[in-house]
């Protein structure tokens, strides 16, 4: 395991079988080592894994654990090509501000907790901008932590494209904790 305590292993076949690729650091393109990915073992850290090279396409956040089939990480298929370690909040502090309009305009809600439904909790249909003041967060396009995922680090996001989304469809979010 690396000095930082991060390690992830990708396997071509289900249940940790077949050829495998180990990583303890960010990798922009590992698809040359594996033709597909059907299972993953995260031995240290929390990882963002991406469908395409250069950290593009669908992204999935995987905390420490075993994922014997791609459905276990909510994958759409067996294609993964890049990965990066997620840097978690030091001190365990989390704070997020979400806005109903772009450029931090309109109604603002501040939270330090996970939210399974922004409609139920904040009476908002979409998130058009946000400020991550503390910690790392995941936005989900559907309620109850489902659908496409977006990783947000500590910074300001003036519009959805800033966090990698094509639209403001954010229906739930949660803190990344280990």
Swiss-Prot record:
Annotated Beta/gamma crystallin 'Greek key' domain residues: 6-44, 45-87, 94-134, 135-177
Single Gene Ontology MF annotation: structural constituent of eye lens
Region (N-terminal arm): 2-5
SMART domains, alphabetized: XTALbg
Modified residues (N-acetylserine): 2
GO biological processes: lens development in camera-type eye; visual perception
Domain of life: Eukaryota
InterPro entries found in the cross-reference section: Beta/Gamma-Crystallin, Beta/gamma_crystallin, G_crystallin-like
Keywords: Acetylation, Eye lens protein, Repeat
Connecting peptide as annotated region, ranges: 88-93
Record text on subunit structure and interactions: Monomer.
Domain remark text: Has a two-domain beta-structure, folded into four very similar Greek key motifs.
Function noted in UniProt: Crystallins are the dominant structural components of the vertebrate eye lens.
Family assignment from sequence similarity: Belongs to the beta/gamma-crystallin family.
UniProt-recorded name of the protein: Gamma-crystallin S
Organism for this UniProt entry: Bos taurus (Bovine)
Gene of this entry: CRYGS
């Amino acid at each position: 395991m690396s000095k930082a305590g991060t390690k992830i292993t990708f396997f071509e076949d289900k249940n940790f079988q077949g050829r495998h690729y180990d990583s303890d650091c960010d990798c922009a393109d590992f698809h040359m080592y594996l033709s597909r990915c059907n299972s993953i073992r995260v031995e240290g850290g929390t990882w963002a894994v991406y469908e395409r090279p250069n950290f593009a396409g669908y992204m999935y956040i995987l905390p420490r654990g075993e994922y014997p089939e791609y459905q276990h990480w909510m994958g759409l298929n067996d294609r993964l090509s890049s990965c990066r370690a997620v840097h978690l909040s030091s001190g365990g502090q989390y704070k997020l501000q979400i806005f109903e309009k772009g450029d931090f305009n309109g109604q603002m809600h501040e939270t330090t907790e996970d939210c399974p439904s922004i409609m139920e909790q904040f009476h908002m249909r979409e998130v058009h901008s946000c400020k991550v003041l503390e910690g790392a967060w995941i936005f989900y396009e559907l309620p109850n932590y489902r659908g496409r995922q977006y990783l947000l680090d500590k910074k300001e996001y003036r519009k959805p494209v800033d966090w990698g989304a094509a639209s403001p469809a954010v229906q739930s979010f949660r803190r990344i904790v280990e």
